[in-house]
Amino acid sequence: MKFVDEAPISVEAGKGGNGALSFRKEKFVAKGGPDGGDGGDGGSVFLVADENLNTLIDYRFQPKYRAEDGEKGASKNCTGAKGDDLLLPVPVGTTVIDMDTEEVFGDLTEHGQRLKVAQGGFHGLGNTRFKSSTNRVPRKTTPGTEGEKRNLKLELKVLADVGMLGLPNAGKSSFIRAVSSAKPKVADYPFTTLVPNLGVVKVQQHRSFVIADIPGLIEGASEGAGLGVRFLKHLTRCRLLLHMVDMAPVDGSNPVDNVRVIANELQKFSPTLSNRDRWLLLNKIDLLPIDEVEARCAAVVKELEWTGPVFRVSALKHEGTAELSGKIMDHLEAIWEEERENPDARALELERQNQMAAEARERIEELREARRQARLAAGEDDDFNEDDYDVEVIYVNY
């Protein structure tokens, strides 16, 4: 299945049914009076979060949706049937943006959660409604109102507590395989990971967190190099970032430079995201000479002037991964406990997430516009959609 994490759609609620103009006509009943019924309300449009979905691909090929109109009223004071609501399933983690106002319309973060995105039109009134002591034969009715119309943009961001950062082949996917039951593809060539992978890390019976691995970044990613930075937006919901660096890179590069490359790209993408709690993971220490591990790891930390937590691991051999998982769990539980006890802390976190999401959208749109201008300058088709030529992948949420 193709992984699609953005889709523009247009939705239109149903029109309300018109009220009926009718008078009672019955044998032996003279001047029976008005009996025109009201119309039915138009159907509304709802988005419904579904945990069984993990892509927005269906909305890429079918972008227009309309709910049912309400039926018109009838004689004998019969009310028209209400139009059926239209329920559109979307993956959990979908953000809804009004494209006309560029405001966030809502966020679907729990299975079964509903969000009304277009209100159905109000029913029209039949002439029965207008009878009075001075108007026994009303001929007035009202039409049903139009349903709401909206142009929306759906953005899917995976729901994870912890996000992985690093260059291609740093060992991020191997780490997720080591600490969870997820089985992302692992190989000795760059860009093995093409879409976000999720894994659930169970520290104890009732203690667990979700970790996300995104495609690796390279220098210039913020300008579109490699797979670009489009997947960085999936980290905006994460409470902790794990910055993994290969301590024995096959290309002979300097681990310190590799850490700085990612930090620079993160800063360019979203300054708020770059200020997230970030732990440094020195991976592949099993490939270093035993007598050099201590000195080389210390040298990297010193040159970086790193003040945050540092961990030495071997994702392939599962060395240090269990201890790290426990410390991550403790860190997350402390955050969650603070937010339960302090509403201000929760409000501040939501503000940060909204700021990161806004910065991510702005940067991604800037890159798309730059690529569009480059295509126009080269005389290429302006209708080209880069997502139509994206890779075909299997995306599984474990």
From Swiss-Prot:
Entry's Gene Ontology BP terms: ribosome biogenesis
Entry GO MF terms: GTP binding; GTPase activity; magnesium ion binding
Species in which this protein is naturally found: Cellvibrio japonicus (strain Ueda107) (Pseudomonas fluorescens subsp. cellulosa)
Domain called Obg: residue spans: 1-159
Residues the record lists as binding Mg(2+): 173, 193
The family this protein is said to belong to: Belongs to the TRAFAC class OBG-HflX-like GTPase superfamily. OBG GTPase family.
Protein name: GTPase Obg
Binding site for GTP: 166-173, 191-195, 213-216, 283-286, 314-316
